[in-house]
């Protein structure tokens, strides 16, 4: 009986930690979308496990941005300065993405921002 109670506490703690991780990723996505749109992005997507709703405790945030004249390293630097430490992010410039990655972004991704033309 004590063993089951202990297991229940472990499961509850893991669920709480996972919920906190999902919330942290959601805040990062929202904040970074604000920053990228202010810089003039045409479109911002989230894709990967977060977009599919399959977040694990080790999941990172996969995002793509269209319409900015920055390399992936420059975009990650912008993200780091905007979000601070503890960054769990892969930020891809749409223009540099392979055809396969673009297909993945379009099929599983969610548009977080799209500039009105």
Predicted features, each with a name:
Residues 1-45, 52-57, 68-117:
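Catalytic core of pol beta-like nucleotidyltransferases
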């Amino acid at each position: 009986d004590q063993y089951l109670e202990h297991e229940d506490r472990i499961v509850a703690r893991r669920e709480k930690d996972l919920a906190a991780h999902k919330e942290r990723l959601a805040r990062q996505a929202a904040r970074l979308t604000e920053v990228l749109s202010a810089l003039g992005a045409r479109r911002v997507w989230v894709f990967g496990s977060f977009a599919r709703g399959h977040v694990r405790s080790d999941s990172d945030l996969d995002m793509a941005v269209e319409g900015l004249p920055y390399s992936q390293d420059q975009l990650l630097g912008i993200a780091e300065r905007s979000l601070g430490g503890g960054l769990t992010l892969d930020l891809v410039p749409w223009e540099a993405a392979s055809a396969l990655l673009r297909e993945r972004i379009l099929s599983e991704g969610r548009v977080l921002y799209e500039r009105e033309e």
